[in-house]
Design a protein with these regions (language model features):
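Conserved C-terminal guanine-recognition region of P-loop GTPase G domains, centered on the G4
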Residues: 69-88
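P-loop/Walker-type NTP enzyme "switch/lid" segment
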Residues: 1-43, 138-139, 144
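Structural beta-sheet core signal
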Residues: 35, 57, 93-95
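Beta-strand-loop-alpha "switch" segments that mediate conformational coupling across diverse proteins
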Residues: 99-102, 111-142
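Histidine-centered active-site loop/cap adjacent to the catalytic His
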Residues: 149-170
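Inter-motif core of Ras-like GTPase G domains
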Residues: 42-63
Length: 171
């Protein structure tokens, strides 16, 4: 891993979804664990959702992406309802890759449409915008806030992280 080679902290542990996810989560005890699973692996996604306290859905600002989110929620709806009956799980959505021009309507329209979708409990007002810093930092194996701590991308990420993890990111 690039982070390890460059001795950048924190050293992030990455586990394969081929392993049993539930066992991996139990081994981490009370710490925060982020599981990133693509919709192409529906079995792993359902397993991750069943173990999750929160499901975070990033949605690009377009009608097609709102429809895709609606379709996804419909596909996993029964599984999510069963999980919610057993706990306090939340499904949270936010607009990702929003246009940097605040007058572009699609971002606002997407946020409004997400609020109407059944299955989404919270729509965050915090957004990540389409910024070159995100793309460039990813190719370096770093987060935008690590490469350019004072950048707009870093500030947007900090704001989103604080909304999601106020006890960790907000301190």
């Amino acid at each position: 891993m690039l982070r390890r080679e460059l001795e950048i902290k924190p050293d992030l542990e990455i586990h394969s979804v081929r392993a049993v996810l539930k066992d991996q989560l139990v081994s981490h005890g009370d710490c925060e664990v982020l599981v990133d699973v693509g919709a192409a692996n529906m079995a792993a996604m359902k397993e991750a959702m069943a173990a999750a306290d929160r499901i975070l859905i990033p949605v690009p600002p377009s009608q097609a992406d709102v429809w895709a989110t609606q379709r996804f929620l419909h596909m996993v709806g029964q599984d999510m309802e069963a999980v919610k009956m057993n706990g306090n799980q939340q499904t949270i959505a936010f607009v990702n890759r929003a246009d940097t021009n605040k007058s572009i309507r699609e971002t606002h329209e997407t946020e409004a449409a997400l609020r109407m979708l059944p299955g989404i409990d919270v729509v965050l007002p915090q957004r990540l915008r389409m910024r070159t810093s995100f793309r460039r930092s990813l190719s370096e194996g770093l987060a935008a806030f690590e490469m350019w701590p004072r950048s707009k991308a870093a500030e947007e990420f900090r704001i989103l992280a604080t909304a999601l993890y106020p006890g960790i990111a907000g301190s």
